[in-house]
A protein has these predicted regions:
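Short, well-structured N-terminal submotif of metal-dependent ribonuclease cores
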Residues: 1-50, 59-70, 95-101, 135-138, ...
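Generic structural signal for residues in well-ordered beta-strands
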Residues: 48, 78-79, 152
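Residues at the C-termini of beta-strands that transition into short coil/loop
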Residues: 52, 82-83, 155-156
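Active-site neighborhoods of divalent-metal-dependent phosphate/nucleic-acid chemistry enzymes
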Residues: 77-135
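C-terminal end-helix/capping segment
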Residues: 130-151
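Short, C-terminally biased terminal segments at protein or domain edges
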Residues: 146-163
Length: 163
């Protein structure tokens, strides 16, 4: 039996999975797709991975809410990446203009997934990660550094795929 593809679960996915339904219709839709994908497909189709950086991010904020996020994260394998390697690819992404300096944490998510040869990165961050205008440059920078870039996608997009 072939192994499942790995998917890096970024902070926004965990936040949408565990938060109360938003009053914003668009965000509420993203929350719905996230919960539906998570409950019906995520573990069946993928090996779920994340990182200590996500762990740090989800531990911030309201104590009860952060506890719910951390409980989800406990079930995932956390990928460890050498700081020097992580910083190098992150710097490459920022220096190439794929992400702005203020999005350093977002560059870490992409770098961790690429360095660990993770096939997919699930996110709702369209500004810096799943930005259709930046994806080609992100891919180019990762490949130039010797890494296969992950496919940057949302849980909604994953519902439309046949794995």
């Amino acid at each position: 039996m072939p192994s499942k593809p790995r998917i890096y679960i970024e902070t926004s996915v965990i936040s949408y999975l565990t938060s109360r339904p938003s009053s914003n219709e668009g965000i509420r839709g993203c929350q719905y797709f996230t919960r539906y994908w998570w409950e019906n497909f995520a573990e069946q189709q993928f090996e779920l991975v994340s990182s200590p950086i996500v762990q740090q991010e989800v531990s911030l904020g309201d104590r009860a809410a952060s506890q719910k996020r951390l409980e989800v994260l406990e079930k995932l394998t956390l990928l460890d990446t050498r700081k020097e390697t992580l910083d190098s690819l992150s710097d490459d992404l920022i220096n190439a203009g794929a992400l702005p300096l203020k999005a350093r944490i977002d560059s870490f998510h992409i770098a961790i997934a690429a360095i660990n040869n993770v096939q997919y990165l699930a996110t709702w961050n369209f500004k810096h990660i799943a930005n259709i205008n930046k994806i080609p440059l992100i891919q180019q920078v990762c490949r130039k550094a010797g890494y296969q870039p992950p496919i940057l996608c949302t849980p909604q997009q994953l519902l439309m795929e046949d794995f």
